[in-house]
Amino acid sequence: MKIGITCYPTYGGSGVIATELGKELAIRGHEVHFISYALPFRLTKYIENIFFHEVDTTSYPLFEFPFYALSLASKMCEVAEFEKLDLLHVHYAIPHAISAYLAKQIVKNKKLKVTTTLHGTDITLVGLEPSFLPLVKFSIEQSDGVTAVSRFLKEKTLTNYYIEKEIDIIPN
């Protein structure tokens, strides 16, 4: 398979899990494309079928904050089309799952699938911000597959967002 993985590249659980998963998938023969604003810190040595695609964010005087989510969606489109990805696996609902949803709607490859892995604060803290609630719910429901790293997180997601979609548990 050709798999695009998006994660936060910084120190922390979700970035570690995503990077180690990508490395294992590459060792097993899959082609893995990391799409992020910086190289994941755990991606320290060369593995033949791992590629990195940097998301550039531009600043524009009219807007106070850079458009990371939109820049990410654009880069996901570019990589998905050029590399003919089968799957975008995103770690974190906000903003990664929203960006993946946009990319999936834009690309010409209608077979592209999106899997979202929920890690914790994207659901229990950030996602509970009232302005993000509808986005989190929508991005989860629009994903082709959803995983959570614990039963607790799965239950929180189902009750906080009234999700009807199946959420698989893959402990980290």
Please provide the spans of the model-predicted regions.
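Active-site proximal beta-strand in glycosyltransferases
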Residues: 3, 87, 102-124, 147
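N-terminal strand-loop element at the rim of the active site
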Residues: 4-11, 23-68, 167
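Histidine-centered beta-alpha loop that forms part of the nucleotide-sugar donor binding/catalytic region
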Residues: 8, 118-121, 171-172
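Alpha-helix capping/helix-boundary segments
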Residues: 40, 95, 152-154
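An amphipathic, basic-hydrophobic alpha-helix
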Residues: 61-87, 97-102, 130-134, 138
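Nucleotide-sugar donor phosphate/pyrophosphate-binding loop at the beta->alpha transition
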Residues: 108-115, 121-141, 155
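A short beta-strand/loop micro-motif in the catalytic core of glycosyltransferases
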Residues: 141-150
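Helix-loop-beta element that forms the nucleotide-linked donor phosphate-binding surface
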Residues: 154-172
